[in-house]
Each structure stands twice: as structure tokens, then as C-alpha cells.
Regions:
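Walker A/P-loop
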Residues: 18-38
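Conserved helix-turn-beta segment of the N-terminal RecA-like "Helicase ATP-binding" lobe
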Residues: 55-81, 172-176, 342
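Conserved Walker A/P-loop ATP-binding site and its immediately adjacent core
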Residues: 34, 43-65, 160-164, 326-329
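Conserved RecA-like P-loop NTPase helicase motor core
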Residues: 105, 132, 331, 344-411
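Conserved helicase/translocase motor-coupling segment
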Residues: 226-340
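Conserved P-loop NTPase motor "coupling/switch" region that bridges the ATPase
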Residues: 45-46, 81-85, 89-92, 122, ...
Length: 411
């Protein structure tokens, strides 16, 4: 039997009697338990839980431990083809009273067209902010489903941008057109950009009314302060370093060749024994997007000053460390530095989930890719985070801090 904290019970009490709800609780306040308990209260025979790929195993463990064991639910991993077939067979057994729950990731959902045949079920979205782009395939698919009940969970439902709430409003049953939503709550102006006119957001209006309307449709907003929880004070220690000189050349000329072995500008070196041509990487910033991408890489991935600072930070402590990174090549270079110090390494990325060292070694270094782990996961065995490079998204930055600064943290 789950015992909820007072603020978690308060969130459930505020949505009592509602079958379409959104729990926008600050990161680290335990949305997982609130959402799953609401699903238990709604008591649908069929439940579909959609989350990030990296959170599949965490959600399955949570549901098995608390609902399969205590309430005899059947839990299915819908990323497994065989279990997906079993789930759909169980759905068809309408005379079977056993509660079933399928767990699937966002990227796979729209590839399982048969899910559109589901009806009378509870739909739960973990990190519902991931459907904020209503034109994306996954968002279109999820918005086309026909659930009886909806549970949305997010610590940053808008990423600071209210215009991205519209798709979640639709799931909550607020029947407002996108045009009217923008007219009532978004301030815009038309600006010229590279010869084209586009609508630029300049601010927001009627925000209190927007939050009131969302509350009427089952949304609960709660910060850590609202929950009455005191967490240890966060201390940010900026480590400043100059960008590599190659960055400035690239920014001026929009093109540069990097030697990936030396992290300096590439110079062809060919003789009888061979050539270094395979170490060349040409960066061409011929569009605004590629220019920005390669500029970021030259400040982080290809900046030797960063690796020197990283080495010094790791050498300065024997505590567990969490390291957030953007690019796989960054992680591989840092992993080599850490292993040379004979410290255990864990990795959480889109391809790898190996947390053994994190769980069992107090001096471990855990590398987490922003997209894979910033928006979910409890890493509060550690109390220090190193940001090797920053993400483009404010939302990922905010959420990443809550991997250690969360309920139960005491240092």
C-alpha cells in the first residue's frame, strides 16, 4: 500500500471527481506516484502509459512493484513485440475484470496504429510537454486517440512558453481553437526575417485567467515551495574558460576543418607511413542551423580547454558525480579521462543504460545524455552535477537539476 506525502494527497484531492487531469508538479515532487494513484482511482480496465524510452524500465518496475503486487494488475512492456500482442489480446477479453496496463514510449506509439482501436481506457502521459508540437507525428497520433480518462504529468508543461500548452488543453477537454487560444493569451507582432515575414511572440496576457481555466479543466500547478518542502540550497559554481581559437575563425568564415585527434585546426600530414586524413572533420556553417550547431560543438566537443577543466573537477573530489552532455563523442572523450583515473563509470543515453557503477560505487562518474535522462530519473545518491556543455532547451536545463535536487535530498 502506497503512503503519499501530504502535497501528493492534496493534488489528488483537488482533482477528485475529474477524469481528465494534469499534475504539473515541480520536478522531484513525486508525480509518478500521484499519476499512478489517480489511475488506480479511475479504475479503468485498460490503461495506456506513454513515456520516454529511457523511462520504460523505471515505469514498469514502479507499476509491477506497486500495482501488480498489491492490486493484481497485469503490466505489459509494449516495446516488446510479443508483450504488445499479449496486451492487445487482453484488451479484447472484455469479460475479464483484470486491470491491465501497457507501457510504451512516445517514438513507438504512432507506429502502432492498432492503438487507435482502443476505447474506454485511461491514457497517462509522462512528461506531457513532449506533445507540445501538435504538428509532430507523435502528437497528432496521441491527440487522435479516444480515451475516457486522461492523466498528464509534467514538471515543465510549457518550457516557459504558454503557446505550447494548446495540445495539452485539448487532451484535458478544453475545446478551444488554436486561433482563439493565441488571441486570448499570446501577444505577437509581425517581423521580417531574411526577407520573410513571420509572427514573433513578444509576451503573454491574461495569464491568471489561463491558469484558472486550466484548473477548471483538472490542472494542478504546484512548486516545491507550495508543497512546503525545504530542500538544500543549490550552489552554482561557474567554471569559465575561453573558447578555442578555431571557434572565432569558424564564426568569421563559417567553415573550418578540425583534427579530431588533436582538437586543433586540421593540417594534412602525409608521408610513407600513412596519412592523418581520416582525422579530418570539416564543419560548414552554410545555414543558420548548422552554423549554430558547429559553433556549439567548437565551444564544447572540440574545445580542449573544456576537457582540461573537466579533468581538474573530477580530480578535486571522490564523491559520486553526475555529468550531463550533448554529443556522444563528448562522452567518449570524458569516459577515457575518467577511466584513466581508475574510477567506475555509468552511462545513460539513448543507446545505453548501465547504472551499475552509480548504484554500487561511491566514487563513480555517471554520464547522462540530456535527451535521455534530463527529464526523468532519481540520481540523488549524488549531490554534484557537472554540465560539460549546455542544452539548447531551457526545459532540459531546468529538469536536469532536479535529478539530484529533489524530495528526500539532505545535502
Amino acid at each position: 500500500m502506497i503512503t503519499l506525502f501530504q502535497h501528493q494527497q492534496q493534488a489528488l484531492d483537488e482533482t477528485e471527481g475529474k477524469n481528465r487531469v494534469a499534475y504539473y508538479l515541480d520536478m522531484g515532487l513525486g508525480k509518478t506516484f500521484v499519476g499512478s494513484e489517480k489511475a488506480l482511482i479511475l479504475n479503468s480496465r485498460v490503461n495506456l502509459l506513454i513515456c520516454q524510452c529511457s523511462k520504460i524500465s523505471d515505469w514498469i518496475d514502479h507499476m509491477v512493484e506497486n500495482y501488480a503486487m498489491n492490486h493484481c494488475w497485469m503490466i505489459y512492456d509494449l516495446t516488446n513485440k510479443k508483450e504488445f500482442e499479449w496486451f492487445m489480446r487482453a484488451v479484447a477479453e472484455t469479460d475479464n475484470p483484470t486491470r491491465i496496463c501497457g507501457v510504451i514510449n512516445y517514438e513507438l506509439t504512432f507506429r502502432r496504429k492498432i492503438l487507435k482501436t482502443l476505447s474506454g481506457f485511461t491514457l497517462m502521459l509522462d512528461e506531457s510537454s513532449l506533445i507540445q508540437n501538435e504538428t509532430a507525428k507523435r502528437s497528432k497520433f496521441i491527440l487522435s486517440l479516444n480515451p475516457d480518462n486522461v492523466i498528464l504529468l509534467s514538471g515543465t508543461p510549457t518550457g516557459g512558453k504558454y503557446e505550447k500548452l494548446w495540445s495539452q488543453c485539448k487532451l484535458l477537454g478544453w475545446d478551444i481553437s488554436k486561433e482563439l487560444f493565441w488571441k486570448q493569451y499570446i501577444e505577437t507582432e509581425w517581423v521580417e526575417d531574411d526577407g520573410f515575414w513571420r509572427q514573433k511572440i513578444t509576451g503573454y496576457k491574461n495569464v491568471d485567467r489561463l491558469k484558472k481555466k486550466l484548473a477548471e479543466h483538472g490542472a494542478v500547478f504546484m512548486t516545491t515551495a507550495d508543497a512546503g518542502i525545504d530542500l538544500p540550497e543549490k550552489t552554482m559554481i561557474p567554471v569559465r574558460m575561453p573558447p578555442a581559437k578555431e571557434y572565432w575563425k569558424f564564426w568569421r568564415e563559417r567553415v573550418i576543418s578540425i583534427n579530431t585527434a588533436t582538437l586543433q585546426e586540421f593540417e594534412l600530414d602525409s608521408d610513407f607511413w600513412g596519412s592523418n586524413a581520416d582525422a579530418e572533420r570539416e564543419l560548414i556553417g552554410d545555414t543558420s542551423l548548422t552554423r549554430r550547431l558547429y559553433a556549439r560543438q567548437l565551444c564544447g566537443l572540440y574545445n580542449p580547454n573544456r576537457y582540461k577543466a573537466f579533468r581538474e573537477l573530477v580530480e578535486s573530489t571522490e564523491d559520486r558525480l553526475i555529468v550531463f552532455y550533448n554529443f556522444t563523442e563528448e562522452m567518449e572523450r570524458m569516459k577515457g579521462i575518467v577511466k584513466a583515473m581508475n574510477r567506475p563509470v555509468s552511462i545513460l543515453s539513448g543507446e545505453v543504460k548501465d547504472l551499475g557503477a552509480y548504484n554500487f560505487h561511491s566514487n563513480s562518474v555517471t554520464f547522462i545524455q540530456y535527451q535521455a535522462g534530463a527529464m526523468g530519473g532519481n540520481f540523488q545518491k549524488a549531490n554534484k552535477i557537472i554540465y560539460f556543455s549546455l542544452p539548447e532547451s531551457w526545459e532540459l536545463w531546468e529538469q536536469s537539476q532536479k535529478r539530484i535536487h529533489r524530495l528526500g535530498q539532505d545535502r
